[in-house]
Structure formats: C-alpha cells, structure tokens
C-alpha cells in the first residue's frame, strides 16, 4: 500500500460535474504499480443542524480510514442538507474544525458540499480538507478559482465548454451530486460518456442512492443501491476494483 497523500500535482480541475485530480508523473507510475484507495460517501443525512451533519460525516470518515482510503468524497451540500428551498448561511470554519481535525488525524483528503457566498450571493460550493494544511478551503461549484495547499493544487473552472481542457495525466474525476430518478439517469449517462470520451475514471457520490465508479473506458466498476454506505475503489496494476461497504 502506498499513499498518495501529499503528492497531488499542480493541475487539478473541477468542472461542472465535479473535481478532477491529477497526480504527477512519478505518482502516476506509482499508482499503476500499487494501491490508490478512494471512496464515495453515499450520505443521506436529513439533520436540522450543521453540528449533527458533522457528527454524521465523522462516522463515514472513520469507516473510510479503517479501509485505508486516501480520498473521501461526500455528495452535494452534504454539510447543510440538499432539501432546502433557499441555501442556508455557510457554516464558519470554527464549526467545521472537527472535520479538518479528522483529515489530519486519519491522513485523508475530504471533499464535502456546502453553500458559499460570492458577491453577496449564495451558491453551491465545496469544502476541501487536506491533511497537510491547517485551513479549510472553500470555493464555488463551476466557477474559476485555484487552490494550492503545499504541493497540491485544485483549480475550479467554468464547465460550460463541451471540450474541457483536461490534463492528459489526470487519473480521476469526482462528481458530488444529489439527484434522483430522471436527473440521476441523466447524470450517470453523462458521467459514463465523460469517462469514455476523456479516458478517465469517474467517481460519483450521490445522496441516498446510486453512487458509482467507472473506469477509464467508461465501464461500470461498481454502483450502489439505496442506503448509507461507502462505495470504494482501489486502483492497482490490474486496474480498478470496487466494493460496497454498509455503515454499521
């Protein structure tokens, strides 16, 4: 087992559907030779407070760490809940400190969903918790921004283009969603085509049901049914393998 913590490359791209991770050349070779463990949290928390959501997230994080995951991705707006008509006030960093502490303690990178404010307007966004950094990083979904924690960088771009400028060394694209029925079918079709077209693995974390992982050929590796669980993926020299881990 070889961890990818601390060795993300400079170019990572979040487009409209999610977040793209680009390990550097040496890391890419290492990944193909050894294990890279990732997980999507199929999180369906319907709590009324951010503190309750955080406690629920910590349960998922501990389980992912138990399975030696390097990266855990939560669905859209996981820290506040996706069902509200209007986006709530973004939680302050002090309130989210337990998640950053967990990232440090377990040495795991976390992506969770929450509202962000830009120019007086609230919009859907992401929070990034990294083991090597003492600050929570926030940015809006689908807008231009960049993030460089130490030797890692995450760049957020506008995803309106039909031809996103993907780094040829990119090995994983993640998508944080909260969709059902028709929109879910649309999403999985879009993500599968994306994986095939750009030859990149895709991890989808969806709230409540239907999280999935596709390989670089667009072939489905694993897809979850309903319920709270971890959908995990491990990449080794033979490619991707997936598993479903129910939460106890």
Where are these regions (language model features)?
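Extreme N-terminal starter segment of soluble prokaryotic enzymes
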Residues: 34-38
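Cys-nucleophile CN-hydrolase/nitrilase-fold catalytic domain and related Cys-dependent amidase chemistry
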Residues: 50-132, 181-200
